[in-house]
C-alpha cells in the first residue's frame, strides 16, 4: 500500500525529498530535483545584446537554444571564480538545465552539483526574511540543515519575476 504524502505550503512533501545542491558565492543553494532537467558541461555561450547582466547569453544544448543565467550576478554575490581566460562562462564548468511549462534555461555553477536526500525534519520552511526589490521575495522555499551546513532551498521559477522572464524568453 502506498503511503499518502501531504504537501506543505512550500510544495515539499512530508517525508524525504531530493534536492540538487550547488555553490553560488560562498553559500550553498539547492533546487528541488523536479526543477532540474539535466546537468551538462557548460557549452560556448553567445552573448546577446541588450539583456540584463545576469543573462550571460544563449547556448546550444542538445539542439535547443536556451538562455544561460548567472545567479551570482543576479543575487549580487561575491564571485568565487574569476572569468577564465579565453572563455565566456566565468570558469563555471557546469550548467543546470531547468525547465517549467513556460521556460527552459540554464543556471551556471562552478562544480558538479550534489544530489541530497533531505528529511522533512531537517527542512525549515518558515524562513521568509528576504526582501529584495530585484527578485520575488517568495523565492526562498526554506533552509535545510545538513551536517552542520545550512543550504538555501530556492524555487528558481519564483526567482525570475515577470519582467526578467520576458527578457529571458526574448534572449532564447
Regions found by a protein language model. Give the residues of each.
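An acidic, low-aromatic, low-complexity terminal/linker signal
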Residues: 1-172
Amino acid at each position: 500500500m502506498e503511503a499518502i504524502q501531504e504537501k506543505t505550503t512550500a510544495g515539499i512533501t512530508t517525508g524525504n525529498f531530493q534536492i540538487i545542491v550547488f555553490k553560488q558565492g560562498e553559500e550553498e543553494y539547492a533546487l528541488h530535483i523536479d526543477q532540474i532537467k539535466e546537468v551538462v558541461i557548460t557549452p560556448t555561450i553567445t552573448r546577446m545584446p541588450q539583456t540584463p547582466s545576469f543573462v550571460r547569453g544563449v547556448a546550444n544544448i542538445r539542439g535547443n537554444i536556451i538562455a544561460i543565467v548567472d545567479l551570482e550576478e543576479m543575487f549580487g554575490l561575491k564571485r568565487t571564480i574569476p572569468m577564465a581566460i579565453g572563455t565566456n562562462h566565468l570558469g563555471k564548468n557546469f550548467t543546470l538545465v531547468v525547465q517549467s511549462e513556460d521556460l527552459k534555461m540554464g543556471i551556471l555553477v562552478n562544480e558538479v552539483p550534489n544530489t541530497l536526500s533531505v528529511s522533512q525534519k531537517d527542512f525549515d520552511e518558515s524562513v521568509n526574511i528576504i526582501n529584495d526589490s530585484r527578485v520575488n521575495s517568495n523565492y526562498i522555499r526554506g533552509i535545510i540543515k545538513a551536517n552542520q551546513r545550512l543550504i538555501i532551498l530556492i524555487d528558481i521559477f519564483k526567482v525570475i519575476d515577470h519582467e526578467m522572464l520576458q527578457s529571458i524568453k526574448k534572449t532564447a
